[in-house]
Amino acid sequence: MQPESAMTPALEVTVLVSIGRHPLTGRVRRADQDARGVELARSLADAEVRLLHAGECNESSEAALRGYLGMGFSELALIEQPEGADVLPALAEALDATSPHLVITGERAERGEGSGLLPYLLAERLGWPLVSGLAAVESVEDGMATLLQALPRGQRRRLKIRLPAIVTVDDAAPTPRQSAYGPARRGTLESSAGEVCNDDEWATWQVQPARPRPKRLKIVKAASARDRFKAAAAKAEGTGGQVLTDVTPTQGAEAILTLLRDEEVLR
């Protein structure tokens, strides 16, 4: 018989996955950031990775969820929730019951409200630390994880946090592998009932197609790494606008609103 320490994984990881939406066609798919989180979890040594989804299960959503199974998993835990339900209580209950060391999720959902607040609300309810913009997990030792956080302009910051913890990933995380058709079809969705809490605020919202995007501010384009570095290091050149000093908060707010209207961010 093997010792218990050899049978117990050094790191238990739960990846929260959601149903994505293709930005051009609108078809359901695996969410890009969640898939990056799955890829990141698979790269961890001595880790037992579990996939968890809370939501409605139908033909289209099942096809999207099987996209995660096609990344090399035999099963996915599904907490059935009706459309429009608040999945926070069900996810918190499931995570509290399984007590993983690390929970990985995307920054925000591609469908529905998409506020990006779910990881923060989960961390608040469970009392766990949260790190956003994760790029890599460097090491896990003695209940502490060394993480690499992505910052603007390609910078990275090394952090140490105590487990259990919740981390979110964005486009800086590893590119997800292609989903394999065979494993995706052979994998199973382990359905279970969870606490249902209606989202009364979301029910009052009106959802409609987004308007054309507003005019973007000037972006410096560079063809080489040297040019990109020079553009990042150079001081911004003033091409208009004004510098406000010794003004009241009301005057400052009015100036900001005027700029946003001029740039057609607000109408």
Curated annotation (Swiss-Prot):
Listed as disulfide-bonded, the cysteine pairs are: none
Q: What Gene Ontology molecular-function terms does this entry list?
A: electron transfer activity
- The answer on whether this UniProt entry bears the keyword Electron transport reads yes
What results from gene inactivation? Deletion mutant loses its ability to grow using DMG as the sole nitrogen source but is still capable of utilizing sarcosine and glycine as the sole nitrogen source.
Keyword terms: Electron transport, Transport
Locate the transmembrane regions by residue number.
Answer: none
Keyword Electron transport in annotation: yes
- InterPro entries found in the cross-reference section: ETF_a/b_N, ETF_b, Rossmann-like_a/b/a_fold
The organism's place on the tree of life at top rank: Bacteria
Summarize the subunit comment.
Heterodimer of an alpha and a beta subunit.
Its job: Participates in the electron transfer process during N,N-dimethylglycine (DMG) degradation to sarcosine.
- What family does the Swiss-Prot or TrEMBL record give for this protein? Belongs to the ETF beta-subunit/FixA family.
- Protein name (Swiss-Prot/TrEMBL): Electron transfer flavoprotein subunit beta
| Lineage of producing organism | Bacteria, Pseudomonadati, Pseudomonadota, Gammaproteobacteria, Oceanospirillales
